[in-house]
Amino acid sequence: MSTQPERAGLEASRLITVLANELKPVPPPQELRFGQSMTDHMLFASYDPVNGWSAPEIKPYGPFTLEPNSSCFQYGTSAFEGMKAYVGPDGEPRLFRPEMNIARFARSAARMSLPPFNPDELLKLIKALVAVEKRWIPAGKGYSLYIRPMIVAIGLLTSNTALLWVMCAPTGPYLKGGSQALSLLAMRDTVRAWPGGTGEYKVACNYGPTINPVQAALDKGYDQTLWLLGDKITEAGVMNVFIVLKRDDGGIDLITPPLDGTILPGVTRDSILALAAAHPARMTLPGLAPTTLLHPSERTMTMTELQAWLAEGRLLEMFSVGTAVVVQPIGNIGYDGKDIALPTFEGGRGPVGQALYERLTDIQDGRFEWEGWSVRCED
């Protein structure tokens, strides 16, 4: 009785590296636009149900061929990630909390019934790719190498045949206005996610349907959408949302919607909550006095509450967070045919948002050591 050979896992030890014969010029930082200048190389691997994962390759970036009837085209069976590499003070590349991104990528792939992979092995492969593309990482605050892992199904119905690749692009500030406060259009009749859906996963089917309402917001002069679920505030565009409130005891509440299945569990979101909880007992956030007590929490927040907090003078700041924007202030919300003006500040961010931004970017760049969040990519 014959036995089938064991399917191969995704293994960094099998990595094959084929470098490009000619390297492209790296654009100067001031010319960088998000996702427009791809680096010289990409990481690539394929999966089939008989052999498992192929030997991963780092090879020149370029197009490849897919069958027209691939499941990813017809049913949107794909998942992706977004993470960044930075130049540390020692000139070496480093990643920010990459294990969280890879774990989320694995969860998203599993939700789409895509083939499993070993997260630790994929992280080793991404480190190897970043080391190869080191020259593409721009230096300076607000600059980084954006890393996009992708996994797509290429079978018909079941997602048992797949391609996985990772591509990179140098990037500067995500928004043209830098830290300028965003103006959002609250969407009541169109929802991004719903209970029992896929809102907590980074899968393609969550993003395509948002393009039309985002364009509608842009056409009306707003920068992005504020997604609602009934009266509940959920996300801003593709970003998590925070509100800063004055407490009766003189402290400050920092609140964000809970992870109820409709909210993407953002790495930046988690980091903001952790840093706020550490101030001032374990470390002091730059620009905030040690006597300023922050009380971070996850709780439902509604447009009705937001307007009441404004009327009471309790709402101090509102900002969005994400891998691309880091911390972006929100200064206006279009809602029910009127604009709701939020507190704005010279320079963009309010004191709490700015303090969290400064500390977070210092950790990302390796200028401030915290909890092992900044991970070096060894050559």
Question: For the regions a protein language model found, what residue spans apply to each?
Answer:
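Extended, Lys/Arg-enriched charged tracts that mediate electrostatic binding to polyanionic substrates
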Residues: 137-152
